Structure formats: C-alpha cells, structure tokens
C-alpha cells in the first residue's frame, strides 16, 4: 500500500470529504469538520492497507494472532496515524491553505474511552507493536459508549461523569452489522442423544446482539495494520406484542437492559447488580469474539482441526478467561467434538498473561450467579474442574493441592485457576513478577506443569512515548545517533557514548526545561496554579491504589512542609510534586487518598511560608493525552509500590525514555530498569520482596514505627488534627494499626531517598548524565521487543512482513 500523498492530493481529498460527509465547503467548515475529514482520509487508507495485508496473510497461510482484553487505552489516533504513515508534514501544509492549523485539529479529538490504566495502555501499545513488526493481528474489546468516566474533583473529592467520547471518536470506527452475532444469557440447558450424537440447546434464554465496529491501528511506515474489533450490545428487537398491549415502559426496559452491557467500562461491583453486569460484559466480549474467530477460520479452512496451528488466542489478564469454556462449548455443541479432542484444541490455542499478584484482582465469581447467568458455560466449567481435579490428583496425590488448584471451590469460580489450567503458556510481565507467580501465586501449578510458565517483560510504544511526545529530544537523538532507534529501540544504547559530552548534556537540560515550561503553561490553564520550571518536577501518575502508595509520597510531602514551617530560614530545594490518577468508582479508600492529597495541596499552595519552595498539584482526569505532556517534563519518576505488589508497570518505562530518573523500590520492572542503568543512575529505597515477606512472617506492627520515628509521629498527628477543616481518620487514624502496604516501614528510607534525589539534582552535570543514561538504557522496554518474544516463545509464529 502506498501511503504517500502530495499536498495537492491531500487538499483535494479534504475538500471532497468536507463536501460528501458534512455538506460544507472548506470556507464553511469548522475545525471539527476538518479533524473528521482528515481522520476519514486516514481511515480509508488504513482500511485499504489492511485489506492488502489480509490478502497477503491469506496467500501466505500465516498464523493469525487474536488478542482479547477488557480494555484498550488508545488515546488519540490522528497524531499517531499521521506519524506512522509519514503524513504529518503533508497534513500540516494541506489544511494551511484553508487557514487551518494541524495542532488545533489534534485538540478536536477526544481520547477514546476504551480503557482505564496500565492494562489497557499496554494492549494499545501491543497493537502498535504488532503492526510495526509486521504480524497479522486483531484485538478484541467492547465499544464502551461512555468510556470509563471523566474525573471531576469537587472540593477534592472524585466525582464520576460520563465520558461522551463517541461523537468525536466514532469517525475512526467502521461498522460491520452484517457480521453481528447473538450472545445468549440465562435460560436452561436442553440435552438429548441421537445416534450417539449429543445435542445441546439453550432454551428460553435472553439474547443480546453483538455488533462489531473496527478501528485501524497503523504500524510504522504502514508496515502492517492492526485491527481493534469493538463489540456494541444491541437489543435483538422491540417486543411488539408487549408494546402494542400498552406496556411501553417494559418493552423499552428490555431493550435498555440488553444495551447496558456496552455502556461503561468496569461498572462498580459493590452490589449484586454490578457483579452481574461485569460478568455479562466478560461473557459478551468472549462469546462474540470466539464466534467471530471460529466463523472466520471455518470460512477459510472448513474445519477446526488445524485451529491451534493457524491461530493464537491470547487472553490479557483474567477478564477474558471465559474464552476457555466458550471455545469448548462451540467445539462440543456446534462442531460435535468429543471432550478430549476439544480440550486439546483449546489448550493448544489459548495463552494467558497474568498482570497481578493482588488477591482481589485474581477474579472469582459467585457460583450461583455464574450458574444462573451462564447455565451451559457453568456446566462446561464444572466438567473442566472435575477433570482437572482428577489430573492434579493423579499427578500429585495431594488433596490440599487439588483443592488449591481447583477451578470451582467454596462456592466460587476461580478465573485465574481456569486461565492457567486451560492455557498452553502462562507468562508474567517482569522478571520479578514471573518469579513471584512461580514461587507464590501459582506455586502449585508450577510444581505440576513447570514448562507452562515463562516471562515477557512489558514494553511501550516508544514511537508514541518518545518520538511523538518529545520531538525535541527525538531530533537531538537523530542528529547524534541516526534514526535507527525509531525502528529498533535497542539502538538507543548508542546514546551512552555522549554521557560525558558537556554540550549534549547541556542540550538535554535545555530540552527538559522547555518541556517543563510547556507543562507549566498547561497546568496554569487547567488548574490556575503557577509552577516553577526550575524546580524539581517530581511525578507520580498512575491508577490510584493503596499498593501504589501515593499516600507514602503524600506523607513525605507533609513531613517536608512541617520541616519548612519549623525552620523557615533553612535551605530547601524548590520541589514541585505532580499527581494524576483515577480511583475506581467503588474504591472508597482510594478516593479518600485523592481527597487527602488535594487538601494537602490546598494547604501548601496557599501558605506564604513555603512559597517558592514547595508546590503540590493534582491534575484531574488523567488520560493518554495528559500523559504525553507529563512524561517529557518529569525529573523524578515515582515508582514506590511495596516490593512484591506491582507486576511490572509501564509508566516507569515512559518516564525513563524521556529522561526522568526513577526513584523507586525493587519492584516490578524497576528491577530491570536498575539492571539497565546501574546503581548510579537510579535511586532505590525500601525493603526487598524477601524482606517484606520476612517482616510479614514475624508480624508487622506499624505502631512501632510511629513510636520510634519522630517524623512519622508529626505527620500522623498532624493528619489526625485535620487539614483545612477536613478529617482523614481512614488514613491517619488507622495507619498505626492497619498498614497493609507498609507505608510506615518504608517511610524513613523513602525520606532519605528523596534527600539523595535533591542533592543529585543540585549537581546539574551529574543529574543530566543520569538522565542521559536512562534514555540510552530504555530501548529494551520497547514493545517491539516484547511482541517478538511473544511471537517466538508463546504464539510460535513469524512476521508476515519483515
């Protein structure tokens, strides 16, 4: 596919789209019209590119990769696709003839409301990597009408508003109503035998129609085009009998209940209705996707005997685990396979990535809910459990192990156990995480099937997070080491040769300052707060969760504030702390931490005693676009989770590749960042995973730390006295006896690490060299590397285009 366009061709195409789709001339068109016109041009080009890519795959009979995830945090598509297809300059000049600036078109596009945190952003990065490396791949998720939510901070308290992203975002979507499939819930299972053939039908079920919409994702230079297929839930039709009998509300209510499935990502599950909706969402995604995959496969081959040879199905975390019993259902009920044959096809086809060691994230569903909502899937799951129990017993003779590894136990369905049992490969997402899976989380499984476990450390789309987000740094790198790093992140290693070049270090410092000035202007506009670009920009941006320990950061900030108040004439390095994070709607403690940080910010930012020394800002509604402005401006990357709780992290990689220095624990991918940059270019603090486990074993008593550390006492006592008239008993009042993530245990070491960071920052040459070494060491965290490892070790395939 030739993606080249001249300025004249682009101008004509824009005018054509404006006329045909919106009925306006270039003179009448708004910026919104121009944005959509350019998006439609790109969408059409990528659609054609995908068609050619598909024909090549068909001709080569290459293996197809299907990647299922509950969320894909795509961000904006216009800038990314223009960059990848090398059309940025053309589309800068073409609209200019109409008096239109491309930068303003970028701002017309909303972030696609299809994801929440690191899991979804990783999935989005992998679609980019798959396309850029030339693999034929398709992602599957749900078309969430209102996204996750828009975060609004009202007096410091997170309030959730619907994210109306589709009016501006649906221009990238191509509907395929002709490929819609039916998804069945509830009902009862009717089984019969006919000449040794087992007939199974679900009777009196509630049917929802899944309608697919395709979004295209370009690889660099258009080498490949990935597709993200998004399913929208539609009612099968209006019950006209009910409507004609005057029961209008009930007729409409049936439709609304069907379509609520694709309204919002991760509805609160603090109540039975929320749990039921989440399970419906998961089965809706899985059933629609598996039906689609099998339909496509049968169209090409006419059999599923060769399924595992021709496709790889990858489940990203436990949300799509129902792929396993759903594929079994199709093979048993629709294709007539016997159990053993079907199970071999499933386990040879499916692979699973685990993303957490947190117990609450290893999903379990109440057995009665599962049975009522998915009766046939429940039957199959029970049979999987029975046979797997027999397998474990025959392998080990250990009744305790059988029970721990069971899929159905104590009234719940354990999704993580089903994922491991039904996959041919299970991987963690950092070296440390994969070891924890083997030694702790899935210890029993590892003892029975050790060959099933492997590691693929996460990666990021470095072309987005470096080349697009930080054009000045990209320009400097290209001038010094060539543009090879754009295609192969490992080439960033060459930048190490300039670690002692004073002019290069000076240039790095100047680029960082300009990025900080840009962020300061954005914060002034959004928050009305003045930031000092010459201060340390200390950044913690990620999902709000207790294990990520945003409150440890806040405790230290409060400690510093109290120190300044005690000694206002002391020598303090100007320090700006930047937070951005959303809390899950039903996660009260996370919301309380946000409120605490906002109250702290209000206290500090309005106190003349600390003016010019300390500033705290909480940026609301954190998303990909905000992150693209934050990452290049950060000096310090806060990665301070309790060791042994973070699977990997990818924010640490995005900050690293933009020259931020990691201040963190030896957790997740921090371990590999430390390995990449060495002791001198990272600031490590806190207990190791082994030390955390040892402390838990002997009994962790946070009160000891409170009693023996004056700084901790001052901080906790101050919190308990209230901040700006607000009290935080859940934070200050409980932490001395309930501190599950050991904030007080790591506090003293964290404070020392912060002091070390300030001293290093004051030595500009040393700090700039540290920054350079982080950029040069970040290449190993490119998603291209991760994708090639998945392809080699798990999917067993090679790129279609090299």
Ranges and model annotations:
Residues 1-802:
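A conserved ligand/cofactor-binding region detector
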């Amino acid at each position: 596919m030739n993606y080249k366009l001249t300025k004249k061709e682009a101008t004509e195409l824009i005018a054509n789209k404006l006329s045909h789709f919106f009925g306006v001339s270039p003179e009448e068109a708004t910026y919104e019209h121009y944005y959509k016109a350019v998006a439609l041009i790109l969408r059409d080009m990528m659609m054609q590119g995908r068609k050619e890519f598909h024909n090549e795959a068909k001709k080569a009979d290459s293996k197809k990769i299907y990647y299922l995830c509950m969320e894909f945090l795509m961000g904006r598509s216009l800038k990314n696709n223009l960059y990848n297809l090398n059309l940025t300059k053309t589309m800068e000049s073409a609209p200019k003839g109409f008096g239109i600036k491309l930068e303003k078109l970028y701002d017309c596009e909303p972030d696609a409301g299809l994801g929440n945190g690191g899991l979804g952003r990783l999935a989005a990065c992998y679609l980019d990597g798959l396309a850029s490396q030339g693999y034929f791949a398709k992602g599957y998720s749900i078309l969430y009408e209102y996204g996750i939510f828009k975060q609004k901070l009202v007096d410091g308290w997170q309030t959730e508003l619907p994210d109306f992203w589709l009016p501006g975002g649906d221009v990238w979507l191509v509907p395929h109503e002709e490929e819609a499939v039916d998804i069945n819930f509830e009902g009862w299972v009717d089984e019969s035998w006919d000449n040794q053939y087992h007939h199974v039908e679900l009777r009196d079920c509630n049917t929802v129609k899944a309608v697919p919409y395709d979004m295209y994702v370009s690889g660099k230079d258009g080498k490949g085009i990935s597709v993200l297929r998004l399913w929208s839930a539609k009612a099968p039709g209006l019950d006209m009998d009910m409507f004609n009998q005057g029961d209008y509300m009930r007729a409409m209510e049936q439709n609304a209940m069907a379509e609520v499935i694709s309204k919002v990502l991760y509805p609160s599950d603090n109540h039975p209705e929320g749990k039921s909706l989440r399970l419906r969402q998961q089965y809706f995604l899985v059933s629609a996707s598996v039906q689609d995959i099998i339909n496509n496969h049968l169209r090409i081959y006419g059999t599923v005997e060769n399924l595992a040879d021709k496709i790889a199905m990858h489940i990203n975390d436990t949300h799509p685990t129902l792929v396993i019993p759903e594929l079994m259902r199709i093979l048993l009920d629709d294709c007539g396979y016997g159990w053993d044959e079907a199970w071999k096809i499933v386990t040879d086809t499916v692979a699973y990535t685990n993303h957490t060691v947190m117990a609450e994230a290893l999903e379990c569903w109440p057995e009665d809910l599962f049975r009522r909502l998915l009766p046939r899937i429940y039957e199959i799951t029970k049979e999987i459990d029975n046979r797997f129990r027999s397998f474990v017993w025959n392998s080990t003779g250990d009744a305790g192990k059988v029970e721990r590894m069971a899929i159905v136990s104590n009234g719940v369905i354990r999704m993580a156990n089903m994922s491991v049992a039904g996959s041919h490969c299970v991987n963690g997402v950092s070296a440390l995480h994969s070891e924890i899976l083997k030694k702790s989380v899935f210890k029993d499984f590892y003892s029975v099937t050790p060959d099933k476990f492997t590691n693929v450390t996460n990666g990021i789309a470095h072309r987005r997070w470096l080349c697009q987000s930080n054009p000045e740094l990209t320009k400097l790198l290209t001038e010094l080491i060539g543009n090879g790093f754009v295609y192969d992140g490992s080439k960033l290693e060459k930048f190490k040769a300039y670690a002692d070049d004073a002019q290069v270090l000076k240039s790095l410092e100047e680029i960082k300052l300009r990025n900080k000035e840009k962020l300061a202007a954005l914060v002034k506009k959004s928050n009305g707060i003045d930031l000092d670009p010459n201060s340390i920009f200390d950044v913690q941006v990620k999902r709000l969760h207790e294990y990520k320990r945003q409150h440890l950061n806040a405790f230290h900030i409060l400690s510093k504030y109290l120190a300044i108040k005690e000694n206002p004439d002391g020598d303090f390095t100007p320090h700006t702390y930047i937070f951005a994070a959303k809390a899950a709607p039903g996660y009260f403690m996370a919301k309380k931490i946000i409120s605490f940080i906002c109250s702290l910010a209000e206290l500090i930012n309005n106190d003349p005693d600390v003016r010019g020394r300390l500033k705290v800002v909480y940026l609301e509604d954190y998303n990909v676009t905000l992150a693209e402005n934050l990452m290049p401006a950060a000096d310090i990357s806060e990665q301070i989770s309790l060791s042994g709780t973070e699977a990997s992290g990818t924010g640490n990689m995005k900050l690293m590749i933009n020259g931020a220095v990691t201040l963190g624990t030896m957790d997740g991918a921090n371990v590999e960042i430390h390995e990449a940059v060495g002791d001198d270019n990272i600031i490590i603090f806190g207990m190791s995973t082994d030390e955390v486990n040892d402390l838990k074993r002997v009994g962790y008593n946070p009160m000891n730390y409170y009693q023996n550390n004056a700084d901790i006492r001052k901080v906790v006592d101050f919190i308990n006295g209230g901040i700006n008239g607000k009290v935080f008993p859940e934070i200050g009042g409980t932490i001395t006896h309930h501190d599950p993530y050991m904030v007080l245990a790591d506090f003293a070491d964290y404070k020392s690490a912060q002091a070390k960071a300030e001293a290093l920052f004051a030595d500009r040459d040393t700090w700039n060299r540290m920054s350079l070494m982080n950029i040069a060491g970040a290449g190993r965290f490119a998603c291209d590397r991760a994708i090639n490892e998945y392809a080699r070790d798990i999917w067993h395939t090679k790129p279609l285009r090299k």
